[in-house]
Amino acid sequence: ACATAGATFLLRTTAGPILQTIQHPLVAISALSALAFFLPSLFAGVPAPVLAVAAIRGRAQSEQALGAMYAAGAVGAIAGTLLAGFLFVPWFGSVATLLTIAATYSVAAFICSWLGRASKTEFLSTSLGLAAVLLLSAGAANMQPVCDRESSYYCIRTVTLSESQTPPIRLMVLDHLAHGISGRDTPRVMFTDHTAMLDALPRMRMRRDEFTSFHIGGGSYSVPRAWADRGISGITVAEIDPEVTSKAEEDFWFEPDMATVVHRDARVALWESEARYDVIIGDAFTDIAVPEHLVTLEFFGLVSERLAPGGVFAMNLIDNTGSLDALAAVAATLREIFPSVEVWTEARPPEPNERRVFVLLAGAEDSPVSAIETKAPGEKRFQALDTGYVDEIIEKTDALVLTDDHAPLSHLMGFNPVID
């Protein structure tokens, strides 16, 4: 109970410094998890073997007692996982969940002390330990939370980037990732490379201001807001987390009448939709967390079915320039469905082992131009990689075609830099 209550302190005091100090997100998340949860997990596992030995000692049919212990452990693990994922974390947050577990341990400690007829000294030591739990819990509950809002999916934060005297510019942070930046007075200006390309490239392909679009992922809603400001209508956004949309409305100047928002998994929403769209945009991908069901051969086939004639599919992707395994796999998979697949990125040589932002354009035909200039937020040039170079990457990496049965894209994107 003390270790679990103490984990709340560790989470709130060390999460910020660890995530800011350790650059690679996988290493940072692993370090934070080990620091906060190693001791609670260790102590939670101690009673089970002790109780198992006590349960079978002196019994003629010890296998029944041992089986009951294992069954109780399995039921508890399943129930705990379900309650944490679908009840406690979504409704109360991670800190309140840990405090609830600490309280449960405390009640169990009192019951065990009573059933075991603890001596006064033992009961006093138990009471002192539980007093420590109470103090730790009260202190943790009063500490400044790391998240502005903790949903079922993300720790959501808003960071103001502009000075107080200038029009506000804000950054949305989902977990550790800077997901989107928006300016109140400049809705058409994109502040990141991936939103700049997702904004400009489909408009370049459409060659008109009136077209329909389906957006996979909302985030700060930078692109839907920019297109609505340009008078583009027929915008549909599939954002799985309602709290993200609420935060976009609250802090990022997104208005509900700018787009039709569907709070569902994007693949399900697209499958259920009977509409055909001129543009489909995939913006649900981060640097280490990838919804694998949105990068498979089967999903890209669904995208192709939902595209109107002459339509285009654009999706962002982050990969390490030292390997480009993930980029090659997605490009190879898209080529199985679409006649034309282009890979766009900033028009500059890559840095060694740089985690580079790419946007893949897929459709029935190639783009009319091989380079564009747009604001991100200053003028920046983006260009399509030569087709021969993309062929070489796919051949060199022996690119895997991703399917619903096997799509290890998170491994290709996130683990290679750590292992290497």
Label every model-predicted segment:
Residues A1-S152, T160-P168, H176-I181, R203-F211, ...:
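Alpha-helical transmembrane segments of multi-pass membrane proteins
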Residues P40, P187-F191, I216:
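Short secondary-structure transition/capping motifs
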Residues I181-L201:
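Class I SAM-dependent methyltransferase Rossmann-like catalytic core
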Residues H194, V295, F299, V330, ...:
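Hydrophobic alpha-helical membrane-association signature
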Residues E210-G218, I372-P377:
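Short alpha-helical "patches" and their helix-cap loops
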Residues F358-D420:
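SAM/dcSAM-binding transferase cores
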